[in-house]
Swiss-Prot record:
The keyword Hydrolase applies. Belongs to the YjjX NTPase family. This is Probable inosine/xanthosine triphosphatase. One of its GO terms (biological process) is nucleotide metabolic process. Its EC number is 3.6.1.73. Homodimer. Its cofactor is Mg(2+); Mn(2+). Keywords: Hydrolase, Magnesium, Manganese, Metal-binding, Nucleotide metabolism, Nucleotide-binding. Mg(2+) binds at residue 36. Binds 1 divalent metal cation per subunit; can use either Mg(2+) or Mn(2+). Phosphatase that hydrolyzes non-canonical purine nucleotides such as XTP and ITP to their respective diphosphate derivatives. Probably excludes non-canonical purines from DNA/RNA precursor pool, thus preventing their incorporation into DNA/RNA and avoiding chromosomal lesions. The keyword Zinc-finger does not apply.
Length: 176
């Protein structure tokens, strides 16, 4: 049995990983453990990649799982607009690495203002929408789209995309 360790205990990230494994028809054991991402509380741009990779590396070290998976949400200024997205990074115990990126979405200026004042995206969302702990539920994307797209949905596709070379290598003996 293959064990995949997620570098988080956030229920949205755990449920998105479970759904991705279901989509891939993989009966792998999943464990979620909180690990350090080594970046700022609110990652910006390249820090998002670094944070996701650090989560994958750190969780595989502490669990000795077959696969370490890190998911990191971040914000970046692109052409004068602030966008949010997530990076999913996977590492096998043999050292194979891959990553994928979620869809990006622009943030309203009210959120950007709070983020630039030092708030995390989830905190900014909670303040603006008068919610609590939205990052463990629908996330900013769910609040902004009235749950047409929620945080779990945003994560499933990049988890699948990050895992496909590992899945193909392990199951189908197809080299990456």
């Amino acid at each position: 049995m293959v064990t995949i360790a997620l570098g988080s205990r956030n229920p949205v990230k755990i449920n998105a990983t479970k759904e991705a494994l279901d989509v891939l028809k993989l009966n792998w054991d999943l464990i979620g453990i909180e690990v350090d991402n080594g970046v700022d509380k609110q990652p910006f741009c390249d820090q998002t990649y670094v944070g996701a990779r650090n989560r994958a590396l750190n969780v595989i070290r502490v669990t000795n799982a077959d696969i370490g998976l890190g998911i990191e949400g971040g914000v970046c200024n692109v052409y004068g607009k602030f966008i949010a997205n997530a990076v999913v990074y996977v590492i096998t115990k043999e050292g194979l690495e891959n990553f994928a990126i979620s869809s990006s979405f622009t943030l309203p200026s009210s959120m950007v203002s709070l983020i630039l004042q030092g708030k995390e995206l989830g905190e900014a969302s909670d303040i603006i929408f008068k919610t609590n702990n939205s990052k463990t539920k629908e996330g900013a994307i769910g609040l902004l789209t009235n749950n047409v797209i929620n945080r779990k949905m945003l994560y499933v596709q990049p988890i699948v995309l990050a895992l496909y070379p590992i899945y193909n290598t392990m199951i189908n003996n197809t080299p990456f």
